């Protein structure tokens, strides 16, 4: 997925990080899993979206990608 395919909030954050306005998160995969976990465990979020977040987090945990 390319940044231009993402929602406006992600594109804004991307531009802020790229410009140095916002700090880069060095542990990006762990931060992503924490965010997905928050979505997956929030009962206010629709069940289908919670399941998508859980699946995405599980895939990251199983993958061989690791934070540097």
Curated annotation (Swiss-Prot):
Entry superkingdom = Bacteria
| Residues spanning the membrane | none
Task: List the Pfam families.
Answer: UPF0253
Q: Which InterPro entries match?
A: UPF0253
Q: Which NCBIfam families match?
A: PRK04964.1 (NF003436)
Give the similarity note.
Answer: Belongs to the UPF0253 family.
Annotated protein name in UniProt? UPF0253 protein ASA_2184
- What high-level taxonomic lineage is stated for the organism? Bacteria, Pseudomonadati, Pseudomonadota, Gammaproteobacteria, Aeromonadales
